[in-house]
Amino acid sequence: MDLNNKVALVTGGASGLGQATVEAYVDKGAKAVILDINEEKASEIIKNLGEDKVMFISTDIMKEDPVVEAVNKIKENFGGLHIAVNCAGTGYPGRILGKEAPHPLDAFQFIVNLNLVGTFNVMRIAAELMDKNEPDEKGEKGVIINTASIAGIEGQIGQSAYSASKAGVIGLTITAARDLARHSIRVCTIAPGIFDTPLMQLAPDKVRDPLLESTQFPHRFGQPNEFADLAVHIVENTYLNGETIRLDSGM
């Protein structure tokens, strides 16, 4: 799919990997809609890229009504939707048995709800609008890109909720791709390694240093623009479907 003149929704688009994806898509000629809760940061992005190119909608992706309302606004403002990128998510540090007590159940449920249920929620509602598109010259109506993590493949000590939620996103990928194939909508997932995002920058050295050691070549943290480059390629390469792609320097 050619990104020029297309409409892309990006959850978590106000920072980190999502922001880089918004910027890359706009650079390719797309209109971008940021679904996030950080209005201040989104406003800065809109100021830099232009109000005619980027729109912000404050959205709780874990709830049905706000996402339905957001997608309806996209339809009203742009006439349709071609691409959805799910970048919104977070983690919760804690072992299953901590020093004081077991891992809090409510924290586990929140992470799974945000990272996995939120992704599915946006995917299903976005796909409904994409299905109304006329197929392009390659017969395609839409592309959905989800964000997992190598933690969902390799596991990560002290991140049971995060790892489980991202494993769920990976497990969803091929099923979603096959479900939506009859609607001419592709689904792929990116599983990033260790990236230099605002969240990672807040981590203490005792957390960052071992993670950096686990990278192979190049021996460094990934940059958000490298994630965005892959998000661009997935859209443009029509034969990519149902894949979970590791982006981790061979960790």
Q: Model-derived features: where do they sit?
A:
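Catalytic Tyr-x(3-8)-Lys segment
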Residues: 113, 205-226
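Residue(s) in the substrate-gating loop at a strand-loop-helix junction
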Residues: 149
